[in-house]
Amino acid sequence: MQIRRGCEADTERLVALAGQIFETEQEIPRALTPLPPENRPQWWCVEEDGALLGGVALYWEDNAWHMGRFVISPELRGRHVGTALLETALTDIFAQDIREVTMEARDTTVHILKKFGAETTGAPFSFYRGTVTPMRLTREAFWNSHTGGQI
């Protein structure tokens, strides 16, 4: 299994994976999954034997960097693959000239992100099937909680 930054050729498959899982599990319409080029999306993915089994995206929206489209195939859940994917993506994101990311996270993801120094910025709210919690994570908080402050 490999966790890596996605390339342009991966985008269609990652959008299809996220769309299928989000629609099936959360009733989110597939039409909401794609990210237009003007949002400058970057993807990270989990790949095994040529199959993409997880992904997360960073994109520019409402004058801020936003992380979302986080998805892990059901057969990989509970094995900390999602945590490793987020760790890889966040390490790469904060190695760029990005100071903060915002996100709306499901409960499981909230717990992972808090370990990386994220904080909630509002109360959970309904989003299709279930709720999401608004969060933000700064570069400084990530490095302090994840690497002891060493860059």
Residue spans for each PLM region:
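Active-site rim helix/loop that mediates acceptor-substrate recognition in acyltransferases
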Residues: 19-48, 52-53, 57
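Conserved active-site tyrosine of GNAT-family acetyltransferases
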Residues: 113-114, 118
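A short beta-loop-alpha structural element at the N-terminal edge
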Residues: 2-14
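Conserved acetyl-CoA-binding loop-helix of GNAT-fold acetyltransferases
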Residues: 72, 78-91
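Short hydrophobic/aromatic beta-strand element in the GNAT-like acyltransferase core
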Residues: 41-45, 55, 69, 102, ...
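Conserved beta-strand in the GNAT
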Residues: 51-59, 66-71
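Conserved GNAT acetyl-CoA-binding A-motif
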Residues: 93-106
